[in-house]
Amino acid sequence: MAVFDTPEEAFGVLRPVCVQLTKTQTVENVEHLQTRLQAVSDSALQELQQYILFPLRFTLKTPGPKRERLIQSVVECLTFVLSSTCVKEQELLQELFSELSACLYSPSSQKPAAVSEELKLAVIQGLSTLMHSAYGDIILTFYEPSILPRLGFAVSLLLGLAEQEKSKQIKIAALKCLQVLLLQCDCQDHPRSLDELEQKQLGDLFASFLPGISTALTRLITGDFKQGHSIVVSSLKIFYKTVSFIMADEQLKRISKVQAKPAVEHRVAELMVYREADWVKKTGDKLTILIKKIIECVSVHPHWKVRLELVELVEDLLLKCSQSLVECAGPLLKALVGLVNDESPEIQAQCNKVLRHFADQKVVVGNKALADILSESLHSLATSLPRLMNSQDDQGKFSTLSLLLGYLKLLGPKINFVLNSVAHLQRLSKALIQVLELDVADIKIVEERRWNSDDLNASPKTSATQPWNRIQRRYFRFFTDERIFMLLRQVCQLLGYYGNLYLLVDHFMELYHQSVVYRKQAAMILNELVTGAAGLEVEDLHEKHIKTNPEELREIVTSILEEYTSQENWYLVTCLETEEMGEELMMEHPGLQAITSGEHTCQVTSFLAFSKPSPTICSMNSNIWQICIQLEGIGQFAYALGKDFCLLLMSALYPVLEKAGDQTLLISQVATSTMMDVCRACGYDSLQHLINQNSDYLVNGISLNLRHLALHPHTPKVLEVMLRNSDANLLPLVADVVQDVLATLDQFYDKRAASFVSVLHALMAALAQWFPDTGNLGHLQEQSLGEEGSHLNQRPAALEKSTTTAEDIEQFLLNYLKEKDVADGNVSDFDNEEEEQSVPPKVDENDTRPDVEPPLPLQIQIAMDVMERCIHLLSDKNLQIRLKVLDVLDLCVVVLQSHKNQLLPLAHQAWPSLVHRLTRDAPLAVLRAFKVLRTLGSKCGDFLRSRFCKDVLPKLAGSLVTQAPISARAGPVYSHTLAFKLQLAVLQGLGPLCERLDLGEGDLNKVADACLIYLSVKQPVKLQEAARSVFLHLMKVDPDSTWFLLNELYCPVQFTPPHPSLHPVQLHGASGQQNPYTTNVLQLLKELQ
């Protein structure tokens, strides 16, 4: 709070200080004065303003050299006084302005003085404070012609500082001060709004500075990006505000044709400018050059705030100077249109706001409306578009397409004037087709196969994102920037929204038919045209535009859909028909013992991958992409039509399901995504809901097409996809079709077996999922290595049981005799015995009908029929079919596990072929067959005991013994070979099989002998773990023999006889010396304790 509130009190305090400063001009005296001033109120300072200013001004005007520090102190003190008071006299304002400006001028060199940065900053702030302190209209009286030389000097001084100084702080301060001098200050209520006469007077005055200001600011704006965005933003703002004020159409039209004689001295009169038509024309031409240069630089500036200020520049100049800067209209509009799709949302929003403003104001540039200028620009751009797309880099393409998109947004429905020109439409379509050409040389697209039918499963929850957000990533020949593709899609959508849809669809359909080279690009464009025509996600700047009629849109979609799904465009070659030719090479060394490494498999893969020339791969890639684009199109059509797409489901759903079952992974994924788009559009909760609701139509189509399989070879895939994505409610509907499939398989087993077996696999997988077995019929044997290894930390259950009773022994012997009969092949006796022991069902005493077995459930009947076919196909010459058949057979056993009377006879039939697969087939088939063996052992173990011990166990044991030395010597790469995987699978499966089949002592010894060598630490770690799991299972069957066998390998303790009459026990492993088996044996013995 001020101490001295009245002028009298303040004068008494300030007078001695002012007198002292007048006598002696030192920094200390100035600082003393400023200290005293801070204790005086503003009102008192206002009364004593000139008295206080006198010693300060006297110090500045004293002739002779002065120290910079003194001048800086005086200027800072002067600024403090001006910030607390108002200047109410014009003469004082002008004198102070001159005195402050002179602080930075060197009379000797007639150039800006070489002073410190601190002094420069102080003077700039002083000038700014002085102009703000001008009271009321005094500021306007300052800008009279007589001030022109002094004002010009200050403007030149500030421009020089802004352009040449290295200090960013001084640059920004100089630009802000320049804004104040040109009455462009951002602060509120300064200055007040000007009337027409005042605007004209100031415009005439400022016109003298326009050349210097515009050229200097242009140099600043187009300078190095490193100078900082704030300097460029300030320069841009001063540039367009100055130009739009001086060149404003409203001012220039009031300029009289006869120049009035100025009432000023001759020297000043020479500096003044008369803004007549000739001057406007010449100045406009020069400004056009500068504006083009600014646009070229600023439109690609990395900082968004600079680009945003460019939008303000365009708006200001086009709204205020559309007549005086008529030549700038094109470049300015081009800049604005190019920023419509800027990456910054703030710039996009501002651009759209400005464009709407232009539309509301109906801006006229010269004698042309804005729409006419845009149409001419679009014509010109369409003409040069093919050349630009062919010659520009990615950034150039992005800028050009942004420009095209902006023109389309602005013109709206008026783009039809361009599209109705055949030449321009052809050039536009040629450019789009050219730039959208795909790169189809990637071999991975063909290589990626959907080997596992589980890939057909789709999540029941559909994504909330728009279909085009999930479009498959693709690679183009002529660009790599993903933003360009997004721009191209937006261009096509806007064409579909505003353009004549019938004309565009007909034109691009003609290109679709014209050449295979154009087909993919034309399909992409057609997809986006439909999406745009629906008006979804299209930003409409023209509120009166009428969207395409839904019925017309549906008709157009129907015609495109028919073309997409036609025979010649839907069923294209996407893979080599002989892709399984390498099977004979796989069979070169049959049997388990032949698998020593994976090199033969590698050779086959290499042979297959490079057996066809590159053009064939390119053509297949091209076909794959065409199908994917058409599938994506169906999804986009569904999104565009919404519920109306339900009317097209009859023609669209079946073909899409065919492709969802395609072996090419890319096609299958895109088709599944398309089905999810259809679900969302038509109001279905999930794919399951979609399929179940349309199953009658689909089943009818499958049944009809199976009768003409040669014409419809993809029919089984539809049923396969249906089964993968439905529930048990579908089974009664497809039961007849399944019988048709089996009948057709019997007829075409030598030609179409692969596709039918895939269907059977999907069917059995679905049945296993829909009808799980609820009884306690044994554990599933497909356990991972981790599950097997977990037994190492558990005590065997057999060792934890309570003491065995006499009844347990009796029951054990009875079970043993019964199982012995079964093992000898007495299946019928076993069945009869089971029937005798079963409790007869209760019947009504009055019912005299003979006993009739209840009919088998539908899924059991189907599983039996399928298993019969699989038994016959187990010996197929095609390896891939055999592998699939083994998978199906495994699932059949799972489905039939609760109906032993049906399962056991079929297992008996399948056994010879299964043994052949286990012992004399390719390694992959052996692996798959062993999986089936484990499942059989789990579901009907007693039935397999003798067969397994006789036909399979010797070969398995022999294979393990033979391979053990190889795996012990192998390096880390060995774990990736097929031989290793087969060893691992056998070791993991032997333990559960031995336990489930309850093998005898001799057979258990065979297993133990074969697995002992894998307890060596020289073996791979995973094989050691699997071998330990075998012995953990053997402990449950025969713990005594297992304990003895392990101690024979390594015995950690010496056994002392409990009585001297007993002979000491000598075990081979009791030598005390450790061996390769010690570690694993100790772990296993610990489990037995």
Curated annotation (Swiss-Prot):
Gene Ontology biological-process entries: positive regulation of DNA damage checkpoint; protein stabilization; regulation of TOR signaling
Keyword Phosphoprotein appears in the UniProt entry: yes
PTM entry text: Phosphorylated at Ser-828 by CK2 following growth factor deprivation, leading to its subsequent ubiquitination by the SCF(FBXO9) complex. Phosphorylation by CK2 only takes place when TELO2 is bound to mTORC1, not mTORC2; leading to selective ubiquitination of mTORC1-associated protein.
Tissue expression summary: Widely expressed.
Disordered as annotated region, ranges: 826-852
Effect of residue 1081 to M: In NEDMIM; uncertain significance
Disease: Neurodevelopmental disorder with microcephaly and movement abnormalities: An autosomal recessive disorder characterized by global developmental delay, impaired intellectual development with language impairment ranging from delayed speech to non-verbal, and delayed walking with an abnormal gait. Affected individuals may show hypotonia or hypertonia with spasticity, ataxia, and choreoathetoid movements. Most patients have microcephaly, non-specific dysmorphic features and short stature. Additional variable features include ocular defects, seizures, brain malformations, and skeletal defects.
Protein's name in the database: TELO2-interacting protein 1 homolog
Source organism: Homo sapiens (Human)
